[in-house]
């Protein structure tokens, strides 16, 4: 169902996990369709996890879990997601970095909500990369939905078409729907990985992958094909700048100040 992270063929030693979860809709009583304020007494069933899918970056093997995988528990209570929440947490505990679309706002918080509900320990809090945040911060796509970005970039855009009936049929125990849900969940990983690989060279706040490597390495992708690319200057310092030949990041700089002590003494700055 899941396994330890790999070193991506020796290219990168950081364990980067891409993942996606699918959840059941809440079931509530309402007096109408629009502008409803749902009180706690109107809640029939809170949302719960249906499936999750994950893969290690640049590795072909995909891991997943779903409620029907645990037949005895599913037969006893088809809404009890403890086993699949635990299996996802176990996999994430092996990761240095996790990647998801809207992961910081939804997936990570939602997972912790279920962990505390079931009395399970917190995950080891790997660093996170949220491709939705990247899209909003660094680009101006007409839509920041994962599918729409994939279509715009022409990467992994052939996603299975679904509607709400798929979720409803899973909740109602339709096994064909469950198989379709797993396929849908797994297929989300394809555009997620391709988009992440395209975007990471544009990020200035990516977790520094250089700390996982020996010698010089790109902070965004861990690649070692760095070429000198001019200089980066601050008001008081000068640093070597590099371009990564693997991900295209051209904003890498060394940490050594190239200005000697005498030159720095002669520098003047504005008082305000």
Which residues make up each language-model segment?
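Short cysteine-rich clusters marking metal-coordination/redox-active sites
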Residues: 218-221, 244-247
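Metal-dependent phosphoesterase core characteristic of DEDDh/y 3'-5' exonuclease domains
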Residues: 2, 14-15, 47-60, 65, ...
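Long, charged amphipathic helices and adjacent flexible linkers at domain junctions
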Residues: 209-210
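Short metal-binding segments enriched for Cys and/or His
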Residues: 246-267
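Residues immediately within or flanking Cys/His clusters that coordinate Zn2+
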Residues: 213-218, 241
